[in-house]
Amino acid sequence: MDSSTAHSPVFLVFPPEITASEYESTELSATTFSTQSPLQKLFARKMKILGTIQILFGIMTFSFGVIFLFTLLKPYPRFPFIFLSGYPFWGSVLFINSGAFLIAVKRKTTETLIILSRIMNFLSALGAIAGIILLTFGFILDQNYICGYSHQNSQCKAVTVLFLGILITLMTFSIIELFISLPFSILGCHSEDCDCEQCC
């Protein structure tokens, strides 16, 4: 009989009050403790939705920039300030990219994607802050933009309301974008599948 087929007996010694039958059907269970805060868990669950919102806001911001492109008509000698700053274009690029990275991180969580997503959301938050500041200057500088050059008072008020409505909508998009991208750039891990100590 060679040593590979030899069986060595195992003896279990239990105290009198414990019997082996109690432990035969025991199931092992593990308790995990999450290091994520409730806010992190909420954002991790809603990542695809928030990423989609960022992309939609980026597309809408770009669309308003295209609308401003057609405002250089007589009698207006210049573009609105917000168009001259370029915010509808570079802001929309930041919003679309940060939203795309959030969706990518939710689909496949890798350390590189998490880092890139945090960087893009940080840049998007900075872009949203810059956009809020530029839009505030736009309200101040261009509040009489339409009526200051047009002599036809009937069209002046209606177009001014439309122009200010677009600026208010852009301001709303920028504020919401700031509230979406800032937590993702600060809180660290985005996904429930991610080991936070590894990527934070």
Curated annotation (Swiss-Prot):
GO terms for cellular component: plasma membrane. Keywords: Membrane, Receptor, Transmembrane, Transmembrane helix. Changing residue 123 to R: In a colorectal cancer sample; somatic mutation. The chain crosses the membrane at residues 53-73, 81-101, 121-141, 160-180. Residues 1-52, 102-120, 181-200 are cytoplasmic. It holds the Pfam family CD20. GO terms for biological process: cell surface receptor signaling pathway. Expressed at high level in the testis. Detected also in the pancreas, heart and in the brain. Residues 74-80, 142-159 are extracellular. InterPro entries: CD20-like, MS4A. Signal peptide: none annotated. It is found in: Membrane. It is a multi-pass membrane protein. May be involved in signal transduction as a component of a multimeric receptor complex. Belongs to the MS4A family. PANTHER family: MEMBRANE-SPANNING 4-DOMAINS SUBFAMILY A MEMBER 5, MEMBRANE-SPANNING 4-DOMAINS SUBFAMILY A MS4A -RELATED. This is Membrane-spanning 4-domains subfamily A member 5. The lineage of its organism: Eukaryota, Metazoa, Chordata, Craniata, Vertebrata.
